[in-house]
């Protein structure tokens, strides 16, 4: 075995040391790099197949992000004690890693490439997501796999009005921005962000500042390449038969332009496909059988290249899009709400031939989604799921679990609404939204943002402002010309150079995602894209506000009602009872769902108003602070020769001494009361330390006070005591708090 040669390089990044190391692990991979930042440590490996795949017309890149519980010092909780399928967070990190790397492989490269990023250690301070991009890029950079990197990546926060690079994870709870930017030394490749209604100027400055640091990280990777990089394998792109393309172009004449310039996607696709079949039939007519398959593939590829160039030429030279729109024009918009009975809220958003129906369901706090990603235990009270069935594009496909794309689109729409959600203190409901894509011709994720905003307002959720989303595109020319397109459709997304999605309110941006298919874009292009996106977003909001501009005043009659109580946290144990016995008895008696927070907030959820009031009364009785002078209607639960025990509240009894049962002398307790009787009693004493309660029936009969009875010698040995807590009821919605949800990128 040859001696290992370990190489490492380091730099200071936001006050912490970033280290890249290779040579210690995974020597059989084409490239392997360990990234360490603080005590967060990831291993990235890159492996390429020896031969290209011949059965595909796209680049077969796979990126996997493996979360290992040992990285957080934990054992998996499953029966087999092994990690299971990737969590949603792991899938989103894998997509985040994939997106800036994919454009940097040579055009026509068809060797299968697999990148695996494995978490070795997580310190809960340094976010592993941007480090995953750095690690994967470094592994590719030092490998022999053709790659046009390296790529740097950082996280940018906006805390107390200032941009910060790679803030510690605990600090992100107070940040109005959670942005990851990735890029080469020359240009920005990818942006992903959630924000609290920030203006375009702040977002652009965050991208620019982040990219400046990305350049330094690229320099660090280049240092490692000099120390340990392997020579790149030679890759010769497949030759392009320009003479074939010229012949097809001449034969087509103006027919391709006529076929693709139709506003209806289905008509346009049918005409284009029919024309393609004609071209293939004409240019393969005299081909020998043994060469027919290869010739057909060549003609098909040539036709696609001609289509690609024609669509781009129309936009760059004439500002004309295939559906007749100009660069800034938005497709016709239709908005409807309240279409679906029984659901708690619904919104149908249609833009051109993209249509999304979003449905809202409200639930109790107990229905929050509990997450445990590498030991970071959190709960989500706002959940958005995105579905993309095959009929939405007129296709047939097997149904199954959500694909990575579905999870990514759902997460983008989810974080775009976080900034406008009411705080839990004001609106304690769990909110689940499901966006059903019914028809798709570009930007269904942004239609999901619009549909979510509509459904929330239709459900009566008091969001701070409506949110709309729009997708921008980009066409660039070899001569340096470029045009930004507003509201791109499917063909422009497929043949264009950028997918730039922006969501927000009239005030500012709440969600952002940018993917590039070229080797990067300039700040000037981004500035124009932001400006054009704002115009488009305001146009969409105007259309939405014409139908519903604010949340409904009342919740759906089918939604549960939640009443909030505030109790002394010291009373939580009494409310729960031994083994949950007490709270379970209240739930069984009323049918209400009861949830308790550590700070003493109690949520009572039920659709039955009478049951809700019954549960409130039981909770208040149980958690009420008993004080001297209080009057109770209690039930006699035990009779003794010296008096009777009366139940005042679940789990709390007091004693009426025989001398306090009646005005006159009582020889036999049962001459006055019997087991099961309900009697009115006054608290005349509470024994310090034990909390034993002394009661008097006599005081209520004579009109005396607790002090009068104590002065007469009743409750001897007892002193006024007890703890004061009370049970403060706030109703369905407590006053608005400034503690609103912070943006999440994932």
Swiss-Prot record:
Spans annotated as Disordered: 704-746
Cofactors that this protein relies on: Mg(2+)
Catalytic reaction annotation: RNA(n+1) + phosphate = RNA(n) + a ribonucleoside 5'-diphosphate
Span of domain KH: 560-619
Cited PROSITE patterns: KH_TYPE_1, S1
Cellular compartments per GO CC: cytosol
Stated name of the protein: Polyribonucleotide nucleotidyltransferase
Organism: Roseiflexus castenholzii (strain DSM 13941 / HLO8)
């Amino acid at each position: 075995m040859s001696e290992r040669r370990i190489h490492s390089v380091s730099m200071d990044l936001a006050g912490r040391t970033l280290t890249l190391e290779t040579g210690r692990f995974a020597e059989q991979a084409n490239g392997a790099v360990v990234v360490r930042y603080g005590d967060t440590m990831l291993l990235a490996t890159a492996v390429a197949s020896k031969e290209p795949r011949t059965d595909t017309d796209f680049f077969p890149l796979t990126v996997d992000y493996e979360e290992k519980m040992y990285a957080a010092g934990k054992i998996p909780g499953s029966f087999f004690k092994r990690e299971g399928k990737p969590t949603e967070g792991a899938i989103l990190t894998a997509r985040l890693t994939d997106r800036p790397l994919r454009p940097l492989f040579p055009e026509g490269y068809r060797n299968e490439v697999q990148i695996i990023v494995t978490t070795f250690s997580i310190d809960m301070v340094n976010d592993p997501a941007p480090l995953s991009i750095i690690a994967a890029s470094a592994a590719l950079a030092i490998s022999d796999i053709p790659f046009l990197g390296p790529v740097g990546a950082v996280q940018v926060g906006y805390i107390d009005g200032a941009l910060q690079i790679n803030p510690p994870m605990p600090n992100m709870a107070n940040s109005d921005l959670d942005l990851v930017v990735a890029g080469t030394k020359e240009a920005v490749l990818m942006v992903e962000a959630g924000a609290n209604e920030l203006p375009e100027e702040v977002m652009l400055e965050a991208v620019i500042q982040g990219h400046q640091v990305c350049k330094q990280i690229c320099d660090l990777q280049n240092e490692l390449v000099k120390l340990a990089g392997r020579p790149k394998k030679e890759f010769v792109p497949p030759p392009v038969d320009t003479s074939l393309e010229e012949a097809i172009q001449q034969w087509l004449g103006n027919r391709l332009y006529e076929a693709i310039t139709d506003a209806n996607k289905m008509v346009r696709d049918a005409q284009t496909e029919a024309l393609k079949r004609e071209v293939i039939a004409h240019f393969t007519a005299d081909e020998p059988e043994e060469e027919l398959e290869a010739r057909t593939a060549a003609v098909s590829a040539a036709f696609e290249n001609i289509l690609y160039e024609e669509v781009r030429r129309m936009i760059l030279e004439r500002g004309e899009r295939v559906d007749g729109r100009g660069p800034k024009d938005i497709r016709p918009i239709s908005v409807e709400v309240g279409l679906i009975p029984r659901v708690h809220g619904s919104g149908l958003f249609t833009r051109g031939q993209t249509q999304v129906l979003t449905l809202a369901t409200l639930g109790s706090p107990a229905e929050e989604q509990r997450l445990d990603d590498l030991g970071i235990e959190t709960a989500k009270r706002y959940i958005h799921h995105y579905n993309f069935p095959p009929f939405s594009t007129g296709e047939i496909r097997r149904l199954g679990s959500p694909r990575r794309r579905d999870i990514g689109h759902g997460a983008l729409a989810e974080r775009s609404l976080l900034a406008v959600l009411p705080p839990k203190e004001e609106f304690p409901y769990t909110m689940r939204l499901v966006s059903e894509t019914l028809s798709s011709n570009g930007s269904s994720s942004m239609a999901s943002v619009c549909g979510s905003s509509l459904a929330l307002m239709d459900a009566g959720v008091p969001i701070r402002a409506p949110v709309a989303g729009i997708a921008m595109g980009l066409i660039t020319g070899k001569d340096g010309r470029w045009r930004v397109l507003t509201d791109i459709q499917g063909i422009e997304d497929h043949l264009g150079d950028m997918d730039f999605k922006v969501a927000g309110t009239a005030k500012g941006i709440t969600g952002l995602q940018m993917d590039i298919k070229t080797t990067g874009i300039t700040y000037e292009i981004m500035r124009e894209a932001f400006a054009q996106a704002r115009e488009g977003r305001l146009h969409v909001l105007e259309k939405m506000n014409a139908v519903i501009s604010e949340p409904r005043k009342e919740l759906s009659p089918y939604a549960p009602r939640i009443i909030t109580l505030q109790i002394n946290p010291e009373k939580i144990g009494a409310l729960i009872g031994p083994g949950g016995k007490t709270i379970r008895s209240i739930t069984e008696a009323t049918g209400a769902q009861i949830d308790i927070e550590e700070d003493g907030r109690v949520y009572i959820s039920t659709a039955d108003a009478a049951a809700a009031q019954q549960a409130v009364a039981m909770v208040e009785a149980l958690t009420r602070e008993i004080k001297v002078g209080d009057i109770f209607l209690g039930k006699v639960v035990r009779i003794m020769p010296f008096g009777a025990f009366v139940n005042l509240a679940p789990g709390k009894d007091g004693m009426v001494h025989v001398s306090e049962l009646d005005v006159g002398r009582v020889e036999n307790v049962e001459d006055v009361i019997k087991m099961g009787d309900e009697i009115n009693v006054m608290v005349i004493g509470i024994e310090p330390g034990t909390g034993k309660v002394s009661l008097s029936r006599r005081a209520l009969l004579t009109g005396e006070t607790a002090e009068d009875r104590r002065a007469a010698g009743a409750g001897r040995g007892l002193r006024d005591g007890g703890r004061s807590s009370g049970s403060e009821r706030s109703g369905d919605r407590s006053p608005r708090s400034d503690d609103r949800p912070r943006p999440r990128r994932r």
